[in-house]
């Protein structure tokens, strides 16, 4: 049996210059692999706990406590375990922590080891990570969601919605979809420049211009699609991440200087969907507004994709409740929201069994680690959300997907 021989961790920096955990796993056959844990900006209340030091260094954001938990506590229980039994490795860490949200060890400690262990096992077998986690049939390239205009918590501007995205559906392969999205991105930059807008980018690589309202980004993106030579609605569709939990105060939604009830905001979305080729709206209502979510799903659930991110936080138990109540029809998948590879896979399988679409997702604080690219293919999520094509930590994922495509991957495209 090939077993885990050593586990270590140290502090590194993410794409926002904040500390995060890099974990390394060494196997008894000499294989060594590592993984870097991402970190979110807008986070759901029920996410697994990201352990920060809360001391003077790095403005309180150091992760030396999480690193110590890997080196001193997690190592003790996973060393000697079968390298190819991912569930046993993850279960051992979960039992050691003893809480539902990893508030003892920190999800950033546990996930780092979980990801590194999976990567080490794949490397030991000399097979790609997506093949190790997904089996022989894992070969479908996801449709990407490119975040090309940022607002909300991801940018310092007057736009309320957090992300305005394009989805290149109408292409026969991933590389052409990637090229189209990139050409639209560059065309958008030229349009913004010509109009005197800032082309500074937000955390995820999208532009963050100071626009007058939440509809102006949609108009600019439609213009960019057309001027780049593509057809909106047929080849390229739009997607929004409203991140509305950030807008929800005292039972109402505050945006564009006005207050909206759940019903009013739902009708606002319905009108946007009539005017623009919107395929997906993420976190259209607050994670606390379940009654509103039921109304949103009844109103638009048969027309567009309604994604729960803060709503479900990649949590199997919460998703099951949402399924029972007919809340949303899709779920964003962020491994660090739940804390381990195994738990992430369990949530995806529950969603897929119940007809919910899955979107593998990055966080705003990312790294050069491309784990989620393989994970999306492994789990056949069908969609991936990992930013614009302008920052290296985002392009690391797209470039990995290009590699996977060379290994006979198929692109989902319109079959989504």
Swiss-Prot record:
Entry's cofactor comment: Binds a second Mg(2+) ion via substrate during catalysis.
CDD domains found in the cross-reference section: enolase (cd03313)
Keyword terms of this UniProt record: Cytoplasm, Glycolysis, Lyase, Magnesium, Metal-binding, Secreted
One cellular component term from this protein's GO annotations in UniProt: phosphopyruvate hydratase complex
Pathway in which this enzyme or protein is active: Carbohydrate degradation; glycolysis; pyruvate from D-glyceraldehyde 3-phosphate: step 4/5
Protein residues bound to Mg(2+): 241, 282, 309
UniProt name for this protein: Enolase
InterPro entries (UniProt xref): Enolase, Enolase-like_C_sf, Enolase-like_N, Enolase_C, Enolase_CS, Enolase_N
